[in-house]
Amino acid sequence: MTDALTITRDLIRCPSVTPADAGALGVLEALLKQAGFTTHRITFSEAGTADIDNLYARIGTEGPHITFAGHTDVVPPGDEAAWSLPAFSGEVRDGYIYGRGAVDMKGGIACSVAAALDYLRDHDGQPKGSISFLITGDEEDVSINGTIKLLQWAAERGEKFDHCVLGEPSNQEVMGDCIKIGRRGSQSGTLIVEGRQGHVAYPHRAENPVPDISRLIVALSDEPLDHGSAQFQPSNLEFTSVDVGNTASNVIPGLARAKFNIRYNDCHTQDSLRALVEERLAKACGNRIRAHIDWLPSNSKVFLTKPGPFTDLAVAAIESVTGRKPELSTTGGTSDARFIASYCPVIEFGLVGQTMHQIDERASVADIATLTKIYRGILDRYFA
């Protein structure tokens, strides 16, 4: 098989901390071009953000069309002196390849490329349909000039995707324990309570917003938003900070703010969720407390790839290699799958995610071989 470990090493050695590409997309483009893929390098820009390089590569012109998606950008390594091996060395020690991005998610991309090249080598260089790669350099930061725009660009060209595999590190403990088939949506906001500033010795001349915001935090936090659904855990609203902008101990503040985030399931849409929280806030305020919510824009909506032939195919490929039947899960944070879901069914399956974003991020060499075999099994079944 094509050596996914070598590709992983070459990618890790590109210090592609967002927004830098540092040659990572070039590594992939060279491999895919050599195998007969038509490749496109697209740079997206937006005022106030860094320009980001993206890569789209496709071989085949007919359906069915499966695309592998991913990101080559990584988070900063942190204190490099704390690493056992240099953060961008890609060195192997004791059965693990070390480096920022080994797990999240250069290893996953390397495995998908290796599997695709092996499949093509065994089928005279052409799939029984189409294989493509959607690779961005803007996932770990603002995600503005990355996958969301790359998908729009592809759609404008007439590209149609039937299914997608996103190689995020989905497994919790061992290879084959989990496929992500959906994600909860994310909505942030700021609760603002108005008072009247005054001297602490004359409280009758002031209105203290601190007790009021405390009551509202309890009111909005205590009652569940829902009790979950068939595929999703219950939604949760979490307050993350409270601030009055006041450093003086003898002044009653005039305003109090509390930031919060909601992770919501398919019991809600973004609009219905906001309406529910606003309704509860109005009830808690009554006629006395003056408060409102400033909602932040969000492109992170809930999505679900319903279990069916595509998930069955992936489960079969995983089980045939690992002997494990993976859980179909919707837990965890957001990913670029939230954008892809608007274009085609998407699943997330990659390496074990235990060390992602940590000092000494590393991937098991054996797991990289296993993932490559699983991706090859998915392709074999997809084009059977």
Swiss-Prot record:
Its EC number is 3.5.1.18. Binds 2 Zn(2+) or Co(2+) ions per subunit. The active site is at residues 73, 139. Zn(2+) 1 binds at residues 71, 104, 168. Zn(2+) 2 binds at residues 104, 140, 357. Homodimer. Belongs to the peptidase M20A family. DapE subfamily. This is Succinyl-diaminopimelate desuccinylase.
